[in-house]
Amino acid sequence: SEMVESGELDAKYVHVESEHSARCCAMGASATGARAFTATSSQGLLYMAEVLTYAAGGRFPIVMMNANRSTALPWNIYGDQRDSLSLLDHGWIQCYAQDNQEALDMALMAYRLAEDPRVMTPVMVNLDGFALTHTYETVEVPTPEQADAFLPPYATTNKFDFDHPVNMGYSAGPEHNRYYKY
């Protein structure tokens, strides 16, 4: 948010009231053709579980960082992958970072993977809560030129087009459901 506020990052920062709303907002942004990102952890990830399947089913190439933390009860802020592992079959590609450099690198790789026309699937980058999220570690931040060379400009055909409307949120019977899920 500081980079957006200072103008260093050309992006919109949207403050929402919950993780459920954050996921819906990211889906809406992606549906209009914008590159979308959000982050969460633990109970927040479980709270947005309902709309994770909508993002996957809609083939929205959203990237989300998840600080892996234990789920309640008991409450704690330490690393535990129970939050993300409980959502393995929700249609998201999941990557697990070993250190903060990997987390940064995977964020860029996640966009490249998610936005590939052959993939068009959201990606969750997981990093250990507390061990990585609450400690300092030196990372090599790529220059904008390096990032641009690795990550092409975002251009998707999977977006709302008022001149060519499509049906989203449709129903699929048993004979077609497997095709959409797998």
What are these regions (language model features)?
Residues 1-86, 91-92, 108-109, 128:
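Thiamine diphosphate
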Residues 11, 92-95, 137-142:
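Short, exposed beta-strand "edge-strand" segments with a Pro/Gly-rich flavor and a Y/T-containing core
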Residues 13, 47, 54, 78, ...:
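Sequence-level detector for tyrosine residue identity
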Residues 123-182:
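Conformationally flexible catalytic loops at phosphate/diphosphate-handling active centers
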